[in-house]
């Protein structure tokens, strides 16, 4: 394009089959068949492929349509799919050749890139309009403001991301605010220049042209400042905007010199022309690599200023003899800004009828359903499983403390294995015996190691950030490096990490207890695992004792009550199985889906956050289906209390009647049987402790990974903040002329006008 303006080249991207990527996500994560969305998947695939085919300097209206459609469809995809579900690769094009690729697993980053492509489109469309017709200049200005609006929208979105405490996305380095600020400022400056050019063609007053010129200079000055702050803006562009800055400053003072001449202010006329010529000289010092059209314009202006200055100086020296003020003594030229970033209307509104994936559940709803399913699992564990295990423990402890059923087994079965011992052996073998425990201990050891690694990862990240901050604080000085120290900024994370370490230290003590608990009963567990043969050899026989009728009746009643204990235990096992089936057959997700469909329009219209709390009423209603089960559990608890009372009374009667007839062989057998009963009770307790330990570490890993992610986000946020502060401090230290952004700003602070120029109206001032 042969022009003295710059356009923003399209970013480049690798082609991916977005439709297929989303299809795989639907298959893995959703409860709907992907075939229901074949048309939508094909449509989004075509849109993404069209994006990868955009060509510089060949823009047409279809480019805008493709970008806008894909941008809006991405908005809906973001609502329906997890943000990190697809990886996209993009290449920067602002430097010398393309840079990258930058790979981002984020739909939001993809949408930012499309907004960038729209800004590029409008910048190129502006340069394709005629610079010699009133209509062409109007359209060009409108396009440039639209381009600035796209880049400004990107800046605002990125600022919101950087302000988030958690869940922030990693912004690619070449889309950092200083680069986007340059692009936005460049577009605004060129839009203002277009109005300036229109004012020339319209023959406007010199006072108007001067104000438009100085404002154009200030906009280019801002662009130069951001260009110097960004590592991705090439020298040609920085020199271009710097030359433009000085060019329009010169043009503004040249127009003011005409006004001074007309107002008989001959000294001020000469001073204004001198400032104009000095600005031209500053522009020429930055002409390297600058477009020939820009330099030709500058040369033409310079020649005009030189010839006018010669005449003005001669007339003043020979005729008027007026004092020539210095630049600082000249009245500032108020700027007249008639442009601003305008987000294209097509971006702000979209036809809902063409939205893709309308019938697909938002992934958030799937997550909410899963969250409530986990809550239901926790409810079942807390309300049924844990209480029943606790009741069973109490019941077993109660029986073993009274030497039951060993005391009556010794009498009734002096040589045979008691049925309870056989059942315990079969149960321990079915669970996996000692192998189950050793495997569980190995698993806990692995989980412990993983937990420690995550903890160390959190500590390492904070240390790295603190070291980086210390280096910059030492380099820049504590007064200049004006941001909170790492110890202050990371205090919340330090507290979390300290608590994590305390939890692990406490858990280590618990692990040691479990190991000692296992070693204590390990020989007896191996005996249980040996089955009938090992047990019959280990348990000593006792001599047969003839019992009187009363003791025999007591033993029979005790046996019945102990059998009732087994019956209650089996009843509870069956009860938990029924609970599991009920929970599995009554998934809460359909209820959440129905509720979402009823209220989704209201939620979206009110822009309300959809989260777990939005469906609390659904969960409360759903969980009432377990009310009858809660009543059963309460009845079972009362039945156990009554049963324990009966056993205790009868056992006391048994002990009082039988203590005189117990011989040594019976005592030894009873002692061994009681030991085996105690081992079984401790085995159940050990299994429970192992499960709790495994659950603790699994939960710890999930929660500590969240902390690790928060630490990553914190470090990233601090690095972005530090880079911006470093650039700010470095810019303060750069010599004035090298930045190319300061000549006009101190002397002529911008005075914003009352409105923004509408191309359909003339130029007006408030």
Curated annotation (Swiss-Prot):
Annotated segments matching region Disordered: 740-766
Compositionally biased residues, Polar residues: 757-766
Coiled-coil ranges from the UniProt annotation: 544-581, 633-692
Keywords in alphabetical order: Coiled coil
CDD domains xref list: BRO1_ScRim20-like, V_Alix_like
Residues that span the membrane, as ranges: none
Matching InterPro entries: ALIX_V_dom, BRO1_dom, BRO1_sf
Pfam families, per database record: ALIX_LYPXL_bnd (PF13949), BRO1 (PF03097)
Ranges for domain BRO1: 4-395
Entry's Gene Ontology cellular component terms: endosome
Role summary: Required for the proteolytic cleavage of the transcription factor RIM101 in response to alkaline ambient pH. May act as a scaffold protein that recruits the calpain-like protease RIM13 via VPS32 to its substrate RIM101.
UniProt xrefs under PANTHER family: PCD6 INTERACTING PROTEIN-RELATED, PROGRAMMED CELL DEATH 6-INTERACTING PROTEIN
Family classification: Belongs to the palA/RIM20 family.
SUBUNIT field: Interacts with RIM101 by binding to its two YPX[LI] motifs.
Protein name: pH-response regulator protein palA/RIM20
Source organism per UniProt: Debaryomyces hansenii (strain ATCC 36239 / CBS 767 / BCRC 21394 / JCM 1990 / NBRC 0083 / IGC 2968) (Yeast)
Gene name of the record: RIM20
